Amino acid sequence: MVQSAPASEIAALILRGFDAYREQFREITDGARARFEQAQWQEAQRASAQRINLYEEKVAETVAGLRAGLADSELLDVERWPIIKSAYIAQIDLRLDDELAETWFNSIFCGLFSHDNISDGTMFVHTTRPSLRAHARAPYTRTYRPGGDLRQALEKIFDDYRFDVPYDDRERDLERIDALLHSNLPDWVCKDPDLAIELIGSVFYRNKGAYLVGRLFTPDEQWPLVFPLLHREGHGIQFDTVITDEAEVSIIFSFTRSYFMVDVPVPAELVAFLKRLLPGKHLAELYTSIGFYKQGKSEFYRALINHLATTDDRFVMAPGVRGMVMSVFTLPGFNTVFKIIKDRFNPSKSVDHATVIQKYQLVKNHDRVGRLADTQQFADFRFPVSKFEPECLAELLEVAPSTVVVEGDVVLIRHCWTERRMTPLNIYLENASEAQTREALNDYGLAIKQLAAANIFPGDMLLKNFGVTRHGRVVFYDYDEICYLTEVNFRYIPEPRFPEDEMSSEPWYSVGPNDVFPEEFPRFLFVDLDQRRLFAKLHGNLYDAKYWQGLQQQIREGKVIDVFPYRRQETPEQLLK
């Protein structure tokens, strides 16, 4: 039975939904330690997907509860929502996750209203929370002061971060990490009496790895510090390496990786700490990396509207070959592309709009192994017409008139995805040196292999569908033909029956909808003969159906293959010689 409710009660109902979401989020996250200790790798993948889907499930549940308990005339009176927002602000004021609570409020509002009603009066378009709150914080880091004895500090770290599974070889790992730190850092650092090591108290879990994250610092300098840990089944926990290079740590927190599972009592505090380690990362990316992808979306949107308000930047079509399914535009000064689905696809494409959306959701939920760009989905973006170059707007209106609409002096984009901008691999290779070409083509092959190991087949593997990041990594970003590797039927081309068969424009053999012939890859992927020959030397096994069938067999047997987000260093024996 519907009834009247004061604004404070509606605010409390919204907050109750948020509490239910946060409780279940923490429950899934807290299970990461046990999954790591028990080597439950498939369960870890399922938990990751479950946590991603949790947000929308709980928003829908909360919206349904509000609709069931309140009259539409009361709930959908937009004039009341500034009062509800004020009541909500008072209720979240002392929370340690208040910025997440604001984003939750926005999600509930958008679940009830069309985007026509968005304003800072009814929603948190801009946050009301200061970036650093003055109230008490829970202690979040552990600090170690070697005082010239780095080995002793490392022993204390090993003691403080114990698991219910023993270390495989504690003494070996201590020697290795000590040697690596002396090797990676300037000579004077490890001897500096003022050197300190600060580590986040919570362990970061993802896929088959666990990570201790922090920094080394002196009064004048600092270095990021990451200890990756592995659980070798039947052997125990081992410290795999140590990373102190900012670029390598940045890759571990990349937009191409799955989200970490990490206990986060105070999200803003953890993000601020990570920002000090990785100043090149935007807040949006850091929130997203620790599982708060909706907060990442809020931070991204705020950065976008600020950029548009404070610069003369205008939208242009993204460089590269025009897509058959998606149209892509960008802001030159904002490191993002915006992707919309065209109204009509090239006849060679067999997908429809619903399938494309499903493919993007598949990527969102799957382990991206550092080779798939994360995306954010937006509805009803509104931008001034003046922020578009005329040629860009004309092309968008031509290819997607059902998605892009001009309403007076505003451009409405009904649906789009945002994605990190990269240099298309085909364009990168046009200007690459011989060494850069070799490195890029090698990484291109590694990207395909690592995706395959994660049960992902890109489908359309043309160079134009891969991008090169600022760190030089090759990443796949065209998802309309992506599928699970185990769905593909890899075949050898049958021998021709007659000499005439080889001259025919049509195949002399039947081809099913999921059939793929790796022998055709060289001609299909490379027009440039030098690149074709080089790739055959680097990754020729990709042209053999047996290679793909072998991976499929391992996946069907339940094996989760190792893909490391960092360069693995020398063995202890090599390093300690």
UniProtKB/Swiss-Prot annotation:
Keywords: ATP-binding, Cytoplasm, Glyoxylate bypass, Hydrolase, Kinase, Nucleotide-binding, Protein phosphatase, Serine/threonine-protein kinase, Transferase, Tricarboxylic acid cycle. Its EC number is 2.7.11.5, 3.1.3.-. Its main location: cytoplasm. Belongs to the AceK family. GO terms for cellular component: cytoplasm. ATP binds at A318, P319, G320, V321, R322, G323, M324, K339. It catalyses: L-seryl-[isocitrate dehydrogenase] + ATP = O-phospho-L-seryl-[isocitrate dehydrogenase] + ADP + H(+). Bifunctional enzyme which can phosphorylate or dephosphorylate isocitrate dehydrogenase (IDH) on a specific serine residue. This is a regulatory mechanism which enables bacteria to bypass the Krebs cycle via the glyoxylate shunt in response to the source of carbon. When bacteria are grown on glucose, IDH is fully active and unphosphorylated, but when grown on acetate or ethanol, the activity of IDH declines drastically concomitant with its phosphorylation. This is Isocitrate dehydrogenase kinase/phosphatase. GO terms for biological process: glucose metabolic process; glyoxylate cycle; tricarboxylic acid cycle. The active site is at D374. GO terms for molecular function: [isocitrate dehydrogenase (NADP+)] kinase activity; AMP binding; ATP binding; phosphoprotein phosphatase activity; protein serine/threonine kinase activity. It comes from the Bacteria. It holds the Pfam family AceK_regulatory. InterPro entries: AceK_kinase, AceK_regulatory, Isocitrate_DH_AceK. It is found in: Cytoplasm. It comes from Pseudomonas paraeruginosa (strain DSM 24068 / PA7).
